[in-house]
């Protein structure tokens, strides 16, 4: 039998194996199809569920319950939540407690609950306080525990001015309880046997008792008498603020209450809405129901009768020693040196400011609490009718703004846009340079005039090149830029205490500070050309100009009789003073040499050096000083002449020390104030100074103005004996 031949049994085996393999492949294929169908169906159901619009969206809960919070599970706003219901914990489901901030450690957990939880907590405490108050003995004093105010017909008798000296001292707001004073006003003790004769006529007199817990008064809450932490006191809707806790919402609302409407409402509105206290212990609180009324017409008087804070600027000073008793010397600092201020509306006792010696006190108007006679005089005052008592004027924030409280110079009401409307013509710099040239030729010697002329001639081509392409509109715009920049600089000059002066590129004074006028004696009106210039001090060897010149005859350029006139003829001029008139000869030459380098050089460069400023002296003042010095030198000996000179110069030499170079160095206290600055340069008419100046350019890159800051060196040369 050949190897390729098979038996029948082998053929049967091969057939069976082929059928098994085919069945196995069919089974595997069917399993794959079933798995694929299941996966497809699952994906379809998932996609259908994801796109189902009727599926409720999961809402983020404001606060999880305690069980879900510990298990880090998703919770809902409803109580009990769904998870606690499924687990059978619905009876123990309550809001979880969050970690408190540091400033809330002293707050109870119930008060930090969101929504109405804090209100319920306050009501439960109120019920407990009522229950405790109803158990008091009849002879015990009663307490008013309402944070809000109810009608005066239901309020008990309250003696606002006790007669006992000890009680007065206890109720007085002294300096010892400023640091530890609570923002919540203390409860007022009311005795049943208290007489109503000591009541102020402005206080309502009623004989009704305090409402009990069983019969509460309308709008009554059981807390402190004047509790600023009560949101109903300022119409705070804590639920609408969407805060997580009561204290955060109250703080936010109080800040908004303090920041809105400051100084915009008259005292009849602001004082009545927020509660005000007068200096005689009376005030007004406008209320409707249990909260403050926003409308002044709906306000009803509650407990106090005066509206608004009295004028504390016109009240006689209070005797602080009698007010605080024998401990008046222990008060730190002098209260009269501190600014006047009012405390923010936190409590009635806090209306008195600890920094004011005339601030209104809660107890009385101006009564002294140390002497018994004063107390008796105050008692007799209560019997005087209200119409005969002196009415204190009412002051409001707008009125305080109009009063002169020595707050310094205010910002002017000038509008910057008015500059662009007022400037119609360009400024004539050519005439200014002609006037400067005439002044230099008249004052300085030929050698010094030549040095100044060389410095100006070096920058003259640059001026011509930059201005030859400018038309009239460009020159007007240049002047508008100058005036706008000067308008901005005037605020800086008034704000800083450094002697400052601003001038044009011609050297004409355009702005000057008050300190510069005090230092040099030049009035602002004279420097700006608004008043005639009668100065005769040119810084010569004698320090004075007698009216004749050593240059011989000279006729200045006939520019204008009003703009420039020789000071030898004593004719007033209306042109602004040149910067060269404020400096001595050497300082003027040095200035123009530095100006030639800086005018078209470094745009942000500056020059810092020393100079001598000339004091403003008229001919009459110079003659008096010269005559006094001549008489002292001729008729007196050396010691008498020295004493006469010291008397003439005032306190010029008091306490001053001299060095080996014949100069007097001033002490810090000797030149303090305006009087000390006026003494500088009294003898020779010169003030030794160091100054720093810079050049500001306009949009055409042309020097526009010169800003100069001056500082005194406190060195005064001694006159020769």
Swiss-Prot record:
Pfam families: PAS_13. SUPFAM superfamilies: Zn2/Cys6 DNA-binding domain. This is Transcription activator of gluconeogenesis ARB_05058. GO terms for biological process: cellular response to starvation; gluconeogenesis. Residues 380-399, 543-553 have a biased composition (Low complexity). Residues 65-93 bind DNA. Residues 1-62, 128-224, 263-300, 353-400, 533-567, 635-666 are annotated as: Disordered. Keywords: Activator, DNA-binding, Gluconeogenesis, Metal-binding, Nucleus, Transcription, Transcription regulation, Zinc. Residues 40-55 have a biased composition (Basic and acidic residues). The keyword Zinc applies. GO terms for molecular function: DNA-binding transcription factor activity, RNA polymerase II-specific; RNA polymerase II transcription regulatory region sequence-specific DNA binding; zinc ion binding. Its main location: nucleus.
């Amino acid at each position: 039998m050949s190897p390729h031949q098979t038996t029948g049994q082998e053929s049967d085996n091969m057939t069976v194996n082929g059928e098994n393999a085919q069945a196995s492949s069919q089974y595997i294929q069917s399993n794959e199809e079933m798995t694929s169908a299941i996966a497809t169906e699952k994906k379809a159901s998932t996609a259908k569920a994801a796109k189902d619009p009727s599926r409720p969206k999961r809402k983020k809960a404001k606060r999880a319950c305690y069980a879900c919070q510990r298990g880090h599970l998703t919770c809902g706003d409803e109580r009990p939540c769904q998870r606690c219901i499924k687990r059978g914990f619905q009876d123990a489901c309550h809001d979880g407690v969050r970690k408190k901030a540091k400033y809330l450690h002293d707050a109870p957990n119930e008060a930090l609950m969101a929504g109405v939880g804090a209100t319920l907590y306050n009501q439960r405490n109120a019920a407990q306080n009522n229950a405790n108050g109803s158990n008091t003995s009849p002879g015990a004093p009663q307490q008013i525990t309402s944070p809000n105010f109810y009608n005066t017909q239901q309020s008990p008798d309250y003696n606002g001015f006790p007669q006992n000296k000890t009680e007065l001292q206890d109720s007085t707001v002294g300096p010892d309880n400023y640091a530890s004073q609570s923002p919540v006003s203390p409860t007022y003790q009311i005795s049943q046997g208290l007489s109503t004769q000591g009541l102020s006529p402005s206080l309502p007199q009623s004989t009704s008792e305090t409402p009990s817990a069983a019969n509460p008064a309308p709008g009554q809450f059981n807390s402190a008498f004047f509790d600023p932490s009560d949101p109903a006191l300022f119409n705070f809707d804590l639920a609408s603020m969407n805060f997580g806790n009561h204290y955060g919402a109250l703080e936010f609302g109080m800040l908004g209450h303090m920041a809105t409407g400051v100084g915009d409402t008259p005292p009849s509105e602001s004082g009545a809405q927020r509660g005000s206290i007068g200096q005689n212990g009376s005030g007004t609180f406008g209320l409707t129901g249990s909260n403050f009324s926003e409308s002044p017409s709906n306000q009803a008087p509650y407990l106090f009768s005066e509206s608004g804070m009295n004028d504390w600027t016109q009240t006689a000073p209070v005797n602080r020693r009698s007010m605080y008793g024998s401990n008046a010397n222990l008060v730190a600092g002098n209260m009269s040196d501190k600014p006047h201020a009012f405390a923010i509306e936190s409590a009635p006792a806090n209306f008195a400011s600890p920094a004011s010696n005339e601030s209104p006190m809660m107890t009385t108007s101006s009564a002294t609490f140390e002497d018994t006679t004063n107390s008796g005089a105050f008692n007799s005052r209560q019997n005087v009718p209200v119409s005969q008592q002196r009415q204190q004027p009412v002051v409001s924030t707008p009125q305080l703004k109009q009063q002169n409280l020595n707050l310094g110079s205010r910002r002017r009401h000038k509008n910057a846009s008015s500059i662009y409307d007022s400037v119609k013509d360009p400024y004539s710099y050519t005439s200014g340079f002609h006037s400067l040239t005439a002044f230099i030729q008249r004052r300085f010697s030929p050698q010094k005039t030549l040095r100044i002329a060389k410095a100006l001639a070096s920058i003259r081509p640059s001026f011509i090149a930059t201005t030859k392409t400018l038309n009239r509109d460009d020159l007007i715009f240049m002047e508008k830029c100058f005036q706008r920049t000067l308008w901005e600089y005037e605020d800086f000059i008034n704000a800083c205490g450094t002697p400052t002066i601003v001038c044009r590129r011609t050297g004409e004074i355009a702005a000057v500070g008050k300190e510069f006028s005090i230092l040099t004696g030049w009035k602002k009106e004279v420097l700006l050309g608004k008043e005639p210039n009668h100065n005769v001090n040119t810084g010569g060897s004698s320090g004075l100009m007698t009216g004749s010149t050593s240059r011989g005859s000279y006729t200045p350029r006939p520019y204008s009789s009003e703009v420039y006139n020789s000071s030898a003829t004593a004719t007033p001029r209306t042109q602004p003073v040149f910067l060269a008139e404020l400096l001595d000869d050497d300082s003027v030459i040095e200035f123009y040499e530095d100006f030639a380098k800086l005018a078209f050089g470094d745009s942000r460069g500056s020059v810092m050096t020393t100079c001598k400023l000339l004091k403003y002296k008229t001919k009459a003042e110079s003659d008096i000083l010269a005559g006094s010095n001549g008489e002292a030198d001729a008729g007196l000996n050396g010691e008498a002449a020295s004493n006469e000179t010291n008397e003439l110069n005032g306190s010029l030499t008091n306490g001053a020390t001299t060095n080996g170079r014949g100069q007097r160095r001033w002490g810090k206290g000797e030149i303090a104030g305006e009087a000390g600055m006026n003494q500088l340069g009294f003898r020779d008419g010169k003030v030794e100074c160091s100054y720093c100046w810079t050049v500001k350019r306009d949009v055409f890159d042309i020097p526009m103005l010169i800003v100069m800051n001056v500082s005194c060196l406190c060195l005064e040369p001694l006159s020769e004996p």
